[in-house]
């Protein structure tokens, strides 16, 4: 009703005479002649640049009119429709495109209809949003291990899910510390997608990573993945418990099953713990105050399961102060291996015994049309309760009814609305009364009632339309018959023979369908129903809203709206099929993809074990639909929600007296009018019809009741506007985590087929595909399974390594998963490399039945050194001999399984390596070099081996080994840089000499990317870097390392992405360390104390930093550089006057710094001074330190030069080669003599002694190589021959000069001759390796190694013991540089990692690593004070006749300073567990 009268003193019922008075007051046009009708509907939210629809309705036109629709903004007016001519009745929906906009803005939309005698103009606001694409990313798996390749796809779609070849301005990878570690810019998608990849470093920051995509519109899209060290689970622990129990339940069933990833049951033992925790736990009052717990433990049954009916009494379900849930934790230990996996379950506790809720009930009622609906009765678990009586009450309708639930727990009701006089209807549903018993801290059961309130629909003529809603989600491609009920007032319809009903459908925020329905009207039949057929297609998903309305002759608009949920379907129907869907490892299978013709499909198949480790949100239609900017437009967006102009005016407030009581009209806010229905659909209406209920005029001086304009979903729309919604015989060795990651194009028939090889992992693979078509858009396949399975297979158990002379037990376990018994023959292939003896009486075959396993063992004694292969085959035999009263079968496929594993057999003692290098350059005549291989007297028998490598480039060996330049650990911030920086010099050199191949470039850039990621682990928040990163208590930033990283990152920018902020922050931090005199203050410890020597520490460090700043191409005029050069200039002038010491290391740095600064005079002056101190011998030049560690007297070969001497000599070489133009002949002559000495110091991997000398020397050699590079006209011929029969020949030419050519020398010791003839220089490198037994002698370190217990008396000593190290420095210096303690494990034992990690709590231990069978302990320095370290080890594999293991402590920068000691396991004789 338009008005409602309220007494001013008290609320009274509305008297009948007043109802007539109210109806007379309402406006009516029943007798008025028909006038032209104009109605235009447009969504209140429009998207720029995309097709939108507006619907026009013109009726009763008596003249031709023109229609104009335009938009107004601060930027001017823009026409959508211009001079559209209409000369007859019209209902039409027209498409238009809103011009592009740079940002979201509210605009005015004006509709103007003009004729000769009539003119209509309305103006309202709409929100224009910029066009948004739907962008998402997909990774090949959700979690990665360090060092793995991350592969991902970027996909872009329009709002109809069709592919967009969008330009992506920026995409980057962000690690868990918010560092950008990889970046791509300005690339365009092809076919709607792009496939990219990048490698993780071997030591990345672990945690949550993101693929971050910046779209053209500026929106940011993120896709998460994890980086973590993990071991794929062998099996899954599934815990099945009730989702909910009530406080009245006395027992619950708990079930736990262990299932292998290939679907078979796990044999083993299960432990289940069920707890109800206290809400506010305290350790002060015992375990009972923390939780009520029950524990169960037993063997799994044949199905791999355990089931228990658990009494709930012990969990005190009615106690209030405990959590309303039971936590179930299960642990299964696999039989035989002891491998453990866990699973969890959760059961909620509820006091709700029964609950009623209304289902499919309208929010409005219409007088005269029954109000129908349903209520659902469920128990506390949510299970429907059938055949129970429900009470339904509606006071406003004066109705109380009883109804019974059906088998689905639903009860239907219908309420007669004829006599409802008010504007709201409240319906109550009740099942049982709740227990009204209250107790402190006790819970009582509850039966939840349901209440529903519906508001009246306003109609002055009492004419209504009602659309039936549906309680379920509609399927795509079905046809829906929408049921429309109507009741029409005779006076309103007049003499009309028919009424036209108009309908619109909205989805995704836009008008998508429109139509009409003509209803014949006969006298006396003004109440009834009809249906409209609507086809459910993808354009309507996921939510469709329908408005149906008619215009009565009196101008009243009568209608209703309804909302339908539609399944999230996609037009491109994709299917994926494996043929077959089960297969043996290494066999072939076919994968078929069915989709719309010419679709581009992305395929993925992932090991189920990966998904168990890290579940992920599956790429689904739901996920894609969630990307839509608008899924369901309701109400008006923010900024468009102001109350619009009402042209109908208002009703005056005329008080009236009835029976002496004063009544005053007030606005009724409960009734819904047609304007409200259309607004709820997000439609703006421009019309000359009256679609609003009358408004009561406001009156001054009277307390006003504010009108509340209902908006169903305004809060949702505001949130939407403020946020951007935006995986026969077999020999198994290939075990990937992602099997398939491919793009395929479907052919014209809609099919693509690819042949794939099944990996060797026995598991279940989860495969899926998405496809993109220009015609039908996106499609997604269901996830399908492929079972990689071996009906039976064999697995080996063996140690990682043994020492020659030790014996171990090799175990082969055969598992049978066939449904029948098999007779299996197991054979260990004989080899001259080991001696194997069966440990049990040898049988030709073994009977193994379903789900059983059998283990065979051999006592093995290795006879050869190096990697020894063990090949074991298990074959199902055709045998008449019965297995448990049945004939064993032979499977048709997979009747034989072979596995190959290798064992490292190491010589006794400690391995040494000696390298002899020569640079031979024949100039017309043949040149030769004698190679004499000698061994010390204490060499371990058969441990010696030697090889010769021939290269045509002095950097050739380094290029082949850029990630293995040093046979040393790389676990700190400085050492990591030796994996990073040389790649820059290699790329620069090859670029300059035009030798760079795509293969080398790809490899070097990969190493740069991974090195970059690793180095960020050592970054501090202020932009500086330290040796072991920002660790609590050890977070002193290191000035020297920060400068090293800064210049390396700056130089790497030309090859890889480096986040500019890292460079800016490091430079800012360094500038803050600069003192007033231009020098830099030292921060953090210098791990190499060669930089600490002499009084010139500050100058040495300042020279290094200045070099770094100049190498990153900062100009000499830069304030920091200018002041730094002032510091160096002052220092050199002081040194020249003899005011300070004369440190060679410092002078070498100064010479290079002044060379970079372009100060050639000072450079020459320093080089002249250095030349006077040079060591000139063997036609080479180098420099040495005044103080250096003593070389052991018993060495029988020339040792490799110390790190500091290589480094300072390389700096002098760089100074000679750094000139304004090109180096002079004199410079190159001097450089050649230095290069001859430097190349002799290289190790067999192309590196030098340590990290910094390797980086500087390779930089210098690459610069020299580029300056002297020429292409030889003839090849160089190299011959290597012995005094005996050995002879081999190599050729080095322009095509293979980067190729590493190597030959093994047959006899050690022995004498060989190398001869080179032809043109060009040849780099010859001989590597000799051998082992020696440690012997008592004087070392620079004191090292004592002990075990606890020391003897085998303690039974636990067979399987676990403690290793204790006592270390001190007793050399020529006050303390050592950074040192490494390398503890090799006794064969068959592994370290307990938590006890190793605890070593890092020691003040001098910076880092620990477990690498293969070694424990590495990083010590920042070792002094003369004894340092004691200890950790635990435990037996992994039994080994007999254990040999002692070696512990070595060495100075990282002075490798000739070391100490070795050996230790034995307490139980060394016989088996370790005997």
From Swiss-Prot:
Chain positions of cross-link Isoglutamyl cysteine thioester (Cys-Gln): 972-975
Pfam family, one: MG3
Subcellular location per the Swiss-Prot or TrEMBL entry: Secreted
Keyword field contains Disulfide bond: yes
Region Bait region: start-end pairs: 623-752
Glycan attachment points: 62, 77, 253, 402, 654, 774, 869, 991, 1366
A GO cellular-component term linked to this record: extracellular space
Disulfide bonds: 55-93, 257-305, 275-293, 476-569, 601-771, 650-697, 821-849, 847-883, 921-1321, 1079-1127, 1352-1467
PROSITE patterns listed in its UniProt record: ALPHA_2_MACROGLOBULIN
Protein name: Alpha-2-macroglobulin-P
Lineage: Eukaryota, Metazoa, Chordata, Craniata, Vertebrata
């Amino acid at each position: 009703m338009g008005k409602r009268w309220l007494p001013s003193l008290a609320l009274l019922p509305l008297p009948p005479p007043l109802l007539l008075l109210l109806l007379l007051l309402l406006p009516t046009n029943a007798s008025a002649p028909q006038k032209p009708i104009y109605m235009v509907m447009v969504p209140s939210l429009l998207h720029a640049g995309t097709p939108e629809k507006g619907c026009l309705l013109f009726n009763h036109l008596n003249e031709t009119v023109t229609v104009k629709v335009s938009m107004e903004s601060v930027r001017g007016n823009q026409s959508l429709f211009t001079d559209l001519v209409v000369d007859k009745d019209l209902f039409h929906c027209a498409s238009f495109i809103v011009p592009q906009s740079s940002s979201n803005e509210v605009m005015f939309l004006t509709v103007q209809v003009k004729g000769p005698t009539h003119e209509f103009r309305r103006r309202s606001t709409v929100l224009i949003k910029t066009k948004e694409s739907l962008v998402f990313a997909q990774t090949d798996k959700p979690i990665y291990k360090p060092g793995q390749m991350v592969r991902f796809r970027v996909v872009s779609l329009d709002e109809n899910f069709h592919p967009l070849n969008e330009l992506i301005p920026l995409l980057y990878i962000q690690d868990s510390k918010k560092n950008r570690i990889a970046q791509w810019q300005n690339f365009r998608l092809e076919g709607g997608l792009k496939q990219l990849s990048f490698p993780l470093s071997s030591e990345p920051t672990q945690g949550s990573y993101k693929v971050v995509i910046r779209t053209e519109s500026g929106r940011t899209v993120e896709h998460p993945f994890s980086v973590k060290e993990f071991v794929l689970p062998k099996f899954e622990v599934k815990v099945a418990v009730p989702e909910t129990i009530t406080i009245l339940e006395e027992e619950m069933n708990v079930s736990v099953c262990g299932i292998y990833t290939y679907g078979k049951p796990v044999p083993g033992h299960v432990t289940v713990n069920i707890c109800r925790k206290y809400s506010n736990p305290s350790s002060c009052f015992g375990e009972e105050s923390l939780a009520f717990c029950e524990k169960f433990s037993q063997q799994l049954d044949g199905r791999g399961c355990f089931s228990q009916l658990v009494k709930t009494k012990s969990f005190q379900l009615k106690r209030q102060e405990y959590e309303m849930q039971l936590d179930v934790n299960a642990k299964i230990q696999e039989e035989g291996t002891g491998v453990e996996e866990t699973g969890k379950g959760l059961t909620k506790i509820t006091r709700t015994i029964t609950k009623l809720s209304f289902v499919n009930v309208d929010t409005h009622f219409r007088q005269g049309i029954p109000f129908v609906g349903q209520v659902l009765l469920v128990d506390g678990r949510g299970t429907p309760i059938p055949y129970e009586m429900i009470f339904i009450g509606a006071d406003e309708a004066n109705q109380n009814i009883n109804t019974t639930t059906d088998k689905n727990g639903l009860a239907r009701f219908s309420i007669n609305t004829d006599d409802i006089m008010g504007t709201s209807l409240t319906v109550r549903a009740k099942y049982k009364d709740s227990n009204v018993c209250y107790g402190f801290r006790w819970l009582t059961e509850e039966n939840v009632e349901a209440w529903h309130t519906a508001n009246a629909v306003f109609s002055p003529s009492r004419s209504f339309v009602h659309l039936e809603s549906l309680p379920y989600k509609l399927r795509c491609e079905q046809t829906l018959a929408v049921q429309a009920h109507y009741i029409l007032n005779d006076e309103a319809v007049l003499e009309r023979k028919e009424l036209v009903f108009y309908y619109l459908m909205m989805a995704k925020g836009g008008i998508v369908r429109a139509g009409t329905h003509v209803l014949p009207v006969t006298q006396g039949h003004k109440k009834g129903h009809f249906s409209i057929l609507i086809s459910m297609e993808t354009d309507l998903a996921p939510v469709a809203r329908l408005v149906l309305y008619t215009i009565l002759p009196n101008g009243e608009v009568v209608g209703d709206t309804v909302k339908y949920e539609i399944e999230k379907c996609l037009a491109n129907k994709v299917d994926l099929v494996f043929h077959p869907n089960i297969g043996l490892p290494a066999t072939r299978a076919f994968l078929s993809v069915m989709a719309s013709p010419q679709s581009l499909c992305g395929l993925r198949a992932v090991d189920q074990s990966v998904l168990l480790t890290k579940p992920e949100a599956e790429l689904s239609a739901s996920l894609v639909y969630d990307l839509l900017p608008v899924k369901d437009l309701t109400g008006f967006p923010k900024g468009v929600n102001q109350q619009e102009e009402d042209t109908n005016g208002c009703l005056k407030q005329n008080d009236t007296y009835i029976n002496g009581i004063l009544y005053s009209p007030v606005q009724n806010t409960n009734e819904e009018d047609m304007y409200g229905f259309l607004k709820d659909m997000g439609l703006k209406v421009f019309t000359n019809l009256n679609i609003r209920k009358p408004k009561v005029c406001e009156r001054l001086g009277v307390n006003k009741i504010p009108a509340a304009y209902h908006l169903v979903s305004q809060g949702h729309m505001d949130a939407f506007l403020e946020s951007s919604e935006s995986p026969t015989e077999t020999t198994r060795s290939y075990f990937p985590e992602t099997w398939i990651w491919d793009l395929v194009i479907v052919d014209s028939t809609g099919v693509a087929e690819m042949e794939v090889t099944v990996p060797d992992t026995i598991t279940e693979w989860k495969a899926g595909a998405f496809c993109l078509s220009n015609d039908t858009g996106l499609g997604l396949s269901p996830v399908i399974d492929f079972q990689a399975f071996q009906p039976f297979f064999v697995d080996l158990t063996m140690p990682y390594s043994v020492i020659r002379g030790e014996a171990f037990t090799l175990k082969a376990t055969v598992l049978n998963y066939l449904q029948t018994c098999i007779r299996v023959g197991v054979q260990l292939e004989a080899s001259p490399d080991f001696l194997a003896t069966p440990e049990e009486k040898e049988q030709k075959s073994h009977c193994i039945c379903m789900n059983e396993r059998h283990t065979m063992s051999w006592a093995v004694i290795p006879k050869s050194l190096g990697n020894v292969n063990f090949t074991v085959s298990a074959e199902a035999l055709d045998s008449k001999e019965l297995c448990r009263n049945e004939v064993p079968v032979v499977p048709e496929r997979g009747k034989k399984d072979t596995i190959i594993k290798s064992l490292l057999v190491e010589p006794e003692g400690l391995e040494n390596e000696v390298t002899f290098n020569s640079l031979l350059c024949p100039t017309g005549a043949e040149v030769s070099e004698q190679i004499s291989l000698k061994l010390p007297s204490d060499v371990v028998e058969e441990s010696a081996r030697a090889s010769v490598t021939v290269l045509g480039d002095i950097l050739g060996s380094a290029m082949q080994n850029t990630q293995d330049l040093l046979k040393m650990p790389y676990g700190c911030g400085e050492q990591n840089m030796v994996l990073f920086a040389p790649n820059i010099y290699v790329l620069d050199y090859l670029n300059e000499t035009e030798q760079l191949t795509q293969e080398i470039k790809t490899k070097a850039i990969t190493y740069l990317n991974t090195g970059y990621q690793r180095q960020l682990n050592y970054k501090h928040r202020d932009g500086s870097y330290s040796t072991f990163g920002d660790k609590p208590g050890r977070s002193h930033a290191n000035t020297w390392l920060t400068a090293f990283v800064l210049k390396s990152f700056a130089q790497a920018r030309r090859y890889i992405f480096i986040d500019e902020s890292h460079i800016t922050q490091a430079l800012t931090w360094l500038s803050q360390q600069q003192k007033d005199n231009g020098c830099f203050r030292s921060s953090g410890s210098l791990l190499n104390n060669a930089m600490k020597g002499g009084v010139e520490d500050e100058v040495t460090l300042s020279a290094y930093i200045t070099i770094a700043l100049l190498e990153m191409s900062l100009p000499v005029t830069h304030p920091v550089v200018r002041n730094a050069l002032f510091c160096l200039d002052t220092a050199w002038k002081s040194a020249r006057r003899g005011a300070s010491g004369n440190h060679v290391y410092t002078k070498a740095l100064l010479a290079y710094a002044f060379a970079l600064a372009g100060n050639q005079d000072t450079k020459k002056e320093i080089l002249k001074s250095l030349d006077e101190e040079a060591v000139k011998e063997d036609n080479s030049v180098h420099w040495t330190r005044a103080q250096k560690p003593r070389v052991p007297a018993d060495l029988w070969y020339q040792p490799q030069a110390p790190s500091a001497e290589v480094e300072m000599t390389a700096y002098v070489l760089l100074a000679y080669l750094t000139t304004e133009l090109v180096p002079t002949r004199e410079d190159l002559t001097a450089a050649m003599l230095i290069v001859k000495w430097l190349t002799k110091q290289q190790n067999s991997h192309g590196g030098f002694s340590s990290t910094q000398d390797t980086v500087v020397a390779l930089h210098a050699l690459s610069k020299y190589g580029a300056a002297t590079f020429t292409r030889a006209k003839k090849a160089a011929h190299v011959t290597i021959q012995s005094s005996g029969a050995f002879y081999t020949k190599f050729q080095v030419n322009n095509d293979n000069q980067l190729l590493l050519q190597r030959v093994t020398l047959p006899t050690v010791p022995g004498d060989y001759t190398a001869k080179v003839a032809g043109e060009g220089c040849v780099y010859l490198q001989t590597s000799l390796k051998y082992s020696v037994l440690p012997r008592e002698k004087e070392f620079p370190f004191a090292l004592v190694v002990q075990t606890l217990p020391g003897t085998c008396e303690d039974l636990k000593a067979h399987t676990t013991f403690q290793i204790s190290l006592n270390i001190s420095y007793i050399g020529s210096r006050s303390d050592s540089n950074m040192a490494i303690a390398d503890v090799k494990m006794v064969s068959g034992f592994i370290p307990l990692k938590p006890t190793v990690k605890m070593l890092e709590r020691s003040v001098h231990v910076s880092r620990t690593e477990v690498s293969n069978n070694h424990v590495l302990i990083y010590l920042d320095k070792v002094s003369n004070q004894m340092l004691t370290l200890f950790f635990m080890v435990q037996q992994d594999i039994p080994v007999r006749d254990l040999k002692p293991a070696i512990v070595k402590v060495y100075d990282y920068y002075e490798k000739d300073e070391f100490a070795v000691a050996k230790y034995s396991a307490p139980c060394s004789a016989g088996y370790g567990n005997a």
